[in-house]
From Swiss-Prot:
Zinc finger motifs (C4-type), residue ranges: 327-346
Sequence segments annotated as region (Disordered): 89-109, 184-211
GO biological process: nucleotide-excision repair; regulation of DNA-templated transcription; transcription initiation at RNA polymerase II promoter
Subcellular locations according to the entry: Nucleus
UniProt name for this protein: General transcription and DNA repair factor IIH subunit TFB4
Species for this entry: Debaryomyces hansenii (strain ATCC 36239 / CBS 767 / BCRC 21394 / JCM 1990 / NBRC 0083 / IGC 2968) (Yeast)
Subunit field text: Component of the 7-subunit TFIIH core complex composed of XPB/SSL2, XPD/RAD3, SSL1, TFB1, TFB2, TFB4 and TFB5, which is active in NER. The core complex associates with the 3-subunit CTD-kinase module TFIIK composed of CCL1, KIN28 and TFB3 to form the 10-subunit holoenzyme (holo-TFIIH) active in transcription.
Major subcellular location class: nucleus
GO cellular component entries: nucleotide-excision repair factor 3 complex; transcription factor TFIIH core complex; transcription factor TFIIH holo complex
Keyword Transcription regulation attributed: yes
Entry GO MF terms: zinc ion binding
Keywords on record: DNA damage, DNA repair, Metal-binding, Nucleus, Transcription, Transcription regulation, Zinc, Zinc-finger
Keyword Translocase: no
Biased composition (Polar residues): 99-109
Amino acid sequence: MDAIADSVFTDIGSSDSPSDDPSLLTVVLDVTPQSWYKIRNQITIQEVAKSLLVFLNAHLSLNNSNQVAFIASTPQGSKFLYPNPEKNYDEVSSKKNGEGSNLNKADSTSSLVGDGMYRQFRIVDEAVLEKLNEIFADISQNVDKSRSNSTLSGALSLALTYTNRMLNLDSSISTTTASAINTTTNANSNKTSSSGTTSNSMSTGGTNTTSLTSMRSRILIVSSNDDNDIKYIPIMNTTFAAQKMKVPIDVAKLGERDSSYLQQASDATNGVYLHIANPEGLIQTLSTAFFIEPSIRSLIILPTNSNVNYRASCFITGKSVNLGFVCSVCLCIMSIIPKEGKCPTCGSKFDEKILAQLRRGVVIPVKKKRKLDSNGNGQSDNVTPEI
């Protein structure tokens, strides 16, 4: 008994070493004007943008190596708000720090974020707010040229492309301590030219002692679009790509109705889907339900909706289908029978007899009400009308 008791109270160390892997958070904001106009009494897109910036800042504060990206899905197309490939943020921050008190009043008033904010927070917030204002001005000037269909699938493609680039090019990201070791080693190697051999050995030693960690990634979609104008095939293609890359797709759905296609994307990638009926407390929802890192999602019951609507889309009309026809060759889904008698996807020719039966409709026997004859006896006539 003593041996058993000793084994019970013996501390057994875990085999897995604790890790604090950096994470990439990509936010995709759908800025379709019609959808935001419908919920203007509940929340505005400016308030949503502020809540998302607080969410991004909180993500950056968890780990010094965390990365963020912000993409807007506009009627004119999808655009990167942060990072902007046309702008060098290091030069912008160095110019601001170098000028100091020499900034004139015009420059200080043009700043969208306070000067006392943390540098990384300020860079992200200013870039996102500046590009959002440009997008709003562009939308107001080009209302007639706006597209009727949603560009959310293109924004998802941009997010996955940027994620793939970060995971491949920066597949091993050094922690803060490792970066400090490399910086110190490089400074020592450049200090004197006579000690080249010594500096090279120190550089090699610093590289070997760095702790390299892998990056994880996730995507958050914020949309208030209630129209069924999202293309099914591009959304499913991006969903399967995210599933292969093991990138969860979280969805914060505003508005009145759920989005069946976004539900499928979130469910297939082990993401979180929430239909937020009261968006006034959006920041609380973002900081709780959508703050779960991908590394711990297998240990937590996700606060998502398990009742997923798996409706498909018609390949001819593009609308969602409850009951339709399926091609036996390529599994193409159709809500109507094509006039050419061929599959719109693979071009296979359908049998004319089967098409004639399908066009004729389904025959269902209908039982009429009983009629009374002259003697008072009931009789029923069974007919089979065509519907």
